[in-house]
Regions:
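Non-catalytic regulatory appendages
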Residues: 43-45, 49-52, 62, 69-84
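N-terminal single-pass transmembrane signal-anchor helix
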Residues: 1-25
């Protein structure tokens, strides 16, 4: 049979392997979330440009990014709205579950798009840093 010492050795080895996996996988997951947020912002930028081409104006700040998935009630040129919208419903949420922030007209460009990062608060560093559609300097 298996002795208690052999069992403890096996459990120690498994714990050691698990620790190595956790230390190496978790940072990669965080990097992937930041990368996804950057890609999402690019996709939303393209959807906003398509909306403007069809509707002749960007959605207002009040209409927000919801205007990309459902026709706003106060939209002019409603007959020009693309059937099915410009992004799928719920796509305007960052990898941490927070809505992307949209402002038109923007302070840094035609429009501003922002993810407040993992903490969902403006500012921050590292994983909590804002991810934006303009060059920060």
């Amino acid at each position: 049979g298996i002795t208690l010492i052999e069992l403890l050795v096996v459990l120690t080895i498994l714990a050691f392997i698990s620790a190595i996996v956790v230390v190496n996988v978790l940072p990669e997951r965080d990097k992937a979330a930041v990368k996804k947020a950057k890609i999402d912002i690019g996709v939303i930028e393209s959807a906003l440009d398509q909306y403007r081409l069809d509707m002749m104006v960007y959605p207002s700040t009040g209409q927000g990014l919801a205007a990309l998935s459902a026709l706003p009630a106060d939209a002019a040129n409603a007959d020009q709205f693309r059937p099915g919208g410009y992004i799928r419903r719920g796509a305007a949420v960052d990898p941490w579950g927070h809505p992307y922030q949209y402002r038109f007209p923007g302070e840094h460009g035609v429009f501003d798009l922002t993810s407040f990062g993992a903490d969902g608060e403006p500012g921050g560093e590292g994983l909590n840093a804002d991810i934006v559609n303009w060059v920060q300097g």
